[in-house]
Amino acid sequence: MAKVYYEKDVTVNVLKEKKVAIIGYGSQGHAHAQNLRDNGFDVVVGLRKGKSWDKAKEDGFSVYTVAEAAKQADVVMILLPDELQPEVYEAEIAPNLQAGNSLVFAHGFNVHFDQVKPPANVDVFLVAPKGPGHLVRRTFSEGGAVPALFAVYQDATGVATEKALSYADGIGATRAGVLETTFKEETETDLFGEQAVLCGGVTALVKAGFETLVDAGYQPELAYFECLHELKLIVDLMYEGGLENMRYSVSDTAQWGDFVSGPRVVTEDTKKAMGAVLAEIQDGTFARGWIAEHKAGRPNFHATNEKENEHEIEVVGRKLREMMPFVQPRVKAGVK
């Protein structure tokens, strides 16, 4: 079982007298910066010129280029997209790191897969809230918190663990609990969850269910409601109280169908396929493929995205959602 740390375990905040540079001001960046500031930390924001720069200024932060922010900071938290981090790190952060500094991440991908190679004289750790930035900020403002993970990759100063817990405490995570892990475990489980269940697995299951009904002659609108729209109702019940809560809340007919039909859809062969996905994450096959795809300009990424967006379930869904003004996406969908 994971070891969990709480507020009572952070007896001395070793970062309170340090300057923290938040690199990036998106979903996580704005939450980390504001929570740390509210907890008395000295925070600056490092960005390239653009909308995020203006937003951070409006929110009252001193904003600098990434290089300028890194140069003056004791702690550098990189909250940029995975694929952008190596280039920004090499060009703007690495030349400005000093011995004893802390290099911090919210995901271990680039360190674990050797895309970012920190010098031996800095501490390297991650603090990863298990929720989106807006939730990290809102719960903090309400006196609560989102749980987080932390891991130490490199302890150059002898107090990297204390620094990691101090940072987690600064964003409020110790109110809920901070689980200790490793860069390897955080990275591999995160990627597996995305690919086999949360994104890849769910979208494949939803499309397969939709196509099965439509191919059998049922109206696509009904197939959409049954296989995609109502998924939120079930996921919310699971989110609130696990599988037990979901099964308690649905009809007995639905629960019995769960018991007798679920294992026929997700079979032992499915688990073997999941094992193959995990193996490709563990041996670096997935990471190498994604890095190569990004460096090539993402031709397959964009082509697949365009094709998927025109699947019948998407065409039908767009029309049906016009009937439901209460269903609004948090962000406008489009090509990244």
Swiss-Prot record:
Mg(2+) 2 binds at residues 190, 226, 230. Keywords: Amino-acid biosynthesis, Branched-chain amino acid biosynthesis, Magnesium, Metal-binding, NADP, Oxidoreductase. One of its GO terms (biological process) is L-valine biosynthetic process. Its cofactor is Mg(2+). Mg(2+) 1 binds at residues 190, 194. InterPro entries: 6-PGluconate_DH-like_C_sf, KARI, KARI_C, KARI_N, KARI_prok, NAD(P)-bd_dom_sf. NADP(+) binds at residues 25-28, 48, 52, 82-85, 133. Pathway: Amino-acid biosynthesis; L-isoleucine biosynthesis; L-isoleucine from 2-oxobutanoate: step 2/4; Amino-acid biosynthesis; L-valine biosynthesis; L-valine from pyruvate: step 2/4. Its EC number is 1.1.1.86. Residues 182-327 form the KARI C-terminal knotted domain. The keyword Hydrolase does not apply. The active site is at residue 107. Binds 2 magnesium ions per subunit. It is an enzyme of class 1 (oxidoreductase). GO terms for molecular function: ketol-acid reductoisomerase activity; magnesium ion binding; NADP binding. It catalyses: (2R)-2,3-dihydroxy-3-methylbutanoate + NADP(+) = (2S)-2-acetolactate + NADPH + H(+); (2R,3R)-2,3-dihydroxy-3-methylpentanoate + NADP(+) = (S)-2-ethyl-2-hydroxy-3-oxobutanoate + NADPH + H(+). Residues 2-181 form the KARI N-terminal Rossmann domain. Substrate binds at residue 251. One of its GO terms (cellular component) is cytosol. It holds the Pfam family KARI_N. Involved in the biosynthesis of branched-chain amino acids (BCAA). Catalyzes an alkyl-migration followed by a ketol-acid reduction of (S)-2-acetolactate (S2AL) to yield (R)-2,3-dihydroxy-isovalerate. In the isomerase reaction, S2AL is rearranged via a Mg-dependent methyl migration to produce 3-hydroxy-3-methyl-2-ketobutyrate (HMKB). In the reductase reaction, this 2-ketoacid undergoes a metal-dependent reduction by NADPH to yield (R)-2,3-dihydroxy-isovalerate. Belongs to the ketol-acid reductoisomerase family. This is Ketol-acid reductoisomerase (NADP(+)) 1. It comes from Bacillus cereus (strain ZK / E33L). The lineage of its organism: Bacteria, Bacillati, Bacillota, Bacilli, Bacillales.
